[in-house]
């Protein structure tokens, strides 16, 4: 599974960090080109694919790609 944040869409609202029940995301410690600290998936192995982050993201910046096993 691969969790991606599209930094072109993300505005750094941190909703994904707040709504994730498993603590998958943290705020990056580095500014991106837009001058924000985007969320990063630091614990992707904890993701249960509940899609709360995707559903709550106002900018549709999050995608989860399921690996074909």
Curated annotation (Swiss-Prot):
This is Uncharacterized ferredoxin MJ0146. [4Fe-4S] cluster 2 binds at residues 47, 50, 53, 57. Residues 2-30, 38-67 form the 4Fe-4S ferredoxin-type domain. Keywords: 4Fe-4S, Electron transport, Iron, Iron-sulfur, Metal-binding, Repeat, Transport. Binds 2 [4Fe-4S] clusters. Its cofactor is [4Fe-4S] cluster. It comes from Methanocaldococcus jannaschii (strain ATCC 43067 / DSM 2661 / JAL-1 / JCM 10045 / NBRC 100440). Pfam families: Fer4_7 (PF12838). Gene3D superfamilies: 3.30.70.20. PANTHER family: FERREDOXIN SUBUNIT OF PYRUVATE:FLAVODOXIN OXIDOREDUCTASE-RELATED (PTHR43122), IRON-SULFUR-BINDING PROTEIN (PTHR43122:SF1). GO terms for molecular function: 4 iron, 4 sulfur cluster binding; metal ion binding; oxidoreductase activity. [4Fe-4S] cluster 1 binds at residues 10, 13, 16, 20.
């Amino acid at each position: 599974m691969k969790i991606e944040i599209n930094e072109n869409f993300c505005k750094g609202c941190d909703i994904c960090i707040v709504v994730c029940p498993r603590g998958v995301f943290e705020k990056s410690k580095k500014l991106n080109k837009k001058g924000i600290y985007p969320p990063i998936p630091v614990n992707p192995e904890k993701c249960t694919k509940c899609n709360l982050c995707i559903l709550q993201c106002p900018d549709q910046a999050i995608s989860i790609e399921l690996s074909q096993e």
